Amino acid sequence: MADINKIAEELGTLTILEAADLVKLLEEKWGVSAAAPVAAAGAAAAPAEAEEEKTEFNVVLTEAGANKIAVIKAVREVKAGLGLVDAKKLVEGTPAVILEAVSKDEANAAKAKLEEAGAKVDVK
């Protein structure tokens, strides 16, 4: 254990250039690369970037709120061609997907309109 502590103390006195030279020497001697962990960390960050690049969103009505009539009207405005009965079924059957695979702008506009009517909405 004393040898390890002595090595750690000596490594602490190295300059950055000396430490870089030591890394190169150890890579050559042991046939390893210090760059491998960096590549693994970069690969782990890739899914987060892919998630940010999402282009299609679903608008989900989670709760109709107190004023169901206003929410039903808002659902009919947001989802073109939807009849009164179908809109009522969607509102009463929460959680319900109102719009699927729409752009972020369209999803946010629909969310704003539905929330203005008193509904609780998630964009996924």
Swiss-Prot record:
Entries under SUPFAM superfamilies matching the protein:
ClpS-like (SSF54736), Ribosomal protein L7/12, oligomerisation (N-terminal) domain (SSF48300)
The molecular function GO annotations come to: mRNA binding; structural constituent of ribosome
The Gene Ontology biological process annotation of the record reads: translation
InterPro entries for the chain: Ribosomal_bL12, Ribosomal_bL12_C, Ribosomal_bL12_C/ClpS-like, Ribosomal_bL12_oligo, Ribosomal_bL12_oligo_N_sf
Keyword annotations: Ribonucleoprotein, Ribosomal protein
Covalent S-S links between cysteines:
none
Q: Give the Pfam families listed for this entry.
A: Ribosomal_L12, Ribosomal_L12_N
Q: What does this protein do?
A: Forms part of the ribosomal stalk which helps the ribosome interact with GTP-bound translation factors. Is thus essential for accurate translation.
Query: What quaternary structure, including any partners, is listed in this protein's UniProt entry?
Result: Homodimer. Part of the ribosomal stalk of the 50S ribosomal subunit. Forms a multimeric L10(L12)X complex, where L10 forms an elongated spine to which 2 to 4 L12 dimers bind in a sequential fashion. Binds GTP-bound translation factors.
Q: What's the name of the protein? A: Large ribosomal subunit protein bL12
Biological classification of the source: Bacteria, Pseudomonadati, Verrucomicrobiota, Verrucomicrobiia, Verrucomicrobiales
Q: Which gene encodes it?
A: rplL
